[in-house]
Regions:
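The substrate-binding groove and active-site-proximal loops of carbohydrate-active enzymes
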Residues: 1-6
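Active-site-proximal substrate-binding groove within the catalytic cores of carbohydrate-active enzymes
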Residues: 8-186
Length: 189
């Protein structure tokens, strides 16, 4: 197995040598290809196929974003559905979508999501702050914040899991300037 991995590294190095500026995407295979050597050679636009069609899709995606963002600044996933929870759960620095593009309702839902997403996308390159503990628990909230100090803007993603009894979540936001006034918008209630 190690010869296979070393061969893969050599292959990627040769591609980069022959094609300067080439950007390589690494499907992370559920995290099995998220080692430091691969991260040096590729970006991870697709973390895992394990979430497609899974009954735990939102929780899995949310947990991946919450955990990976500690140490991997650019990674992505996306959504295979156009409901608001699926789209927001897959939101991050990059992403992809697997929908029926012949379905006008699906295309409209994706268009509305993209209009919203494109306004905040630059913030996903900012500092990352987890606002809750990491959890797959369906009774818990999970939340995190991306903050761009240079823009004085943040995005907070907070998800109330399906069996959570608390209707509200109190968190301490990072990067706020004392005495500064802030405008708060909601993507979904």
């Amino acid at each position: 197995e190690i010869r296979h991995i070393n061969g893969l590294y050599a292959f990627l190095d040769e591609l980069a040598r022959r094609h300067p500026g080439l950007i390589l995407d690494n499907c992370a295979a559920g995290g099995r290809r998220l080692d430091f050597e691969m991260m040096r050679r590729c970006i991870v636009l697709w973390r895992s196929d394990s979430t497609w069609g899974a009954k735990t899709f939102p929780q899995n995606v949310q947990a991946m974003t919450h955990g990976l963002s500690y140490w991997l600044p650019l990674h992505g996933l996306g959504a295979a559905a156009t409901d608001d929870l699926a789209l927001r759960s897959g939101m991050g620095a990059c992403g992809g979508f697997s929908i029926n593009y012949r379905d006008p309702k699906a295309v409209l839902a994706l268009r509305m999501y993209l209009d919203r997403y494109l306004k905040i996308r630059p913030i996903f390159t900012g500092d990352y702050y987890p606002l809750t503990a990491h959890s797959l628990d369906k009774t818990a909230w999970i939340a995190w914040q991306y903050h761009r100090a240079d823009l004085n803007e943040s995005v907070v993603q907070a998800f109330r899991r399906p069996e959570a009894t608390s209707e509200t979540l109190t968190v301490k936001l990072r990067g706020l300037i004392p005495e500064q006034r802030y405008e708060i918008g909601r993507a979904h209630v």
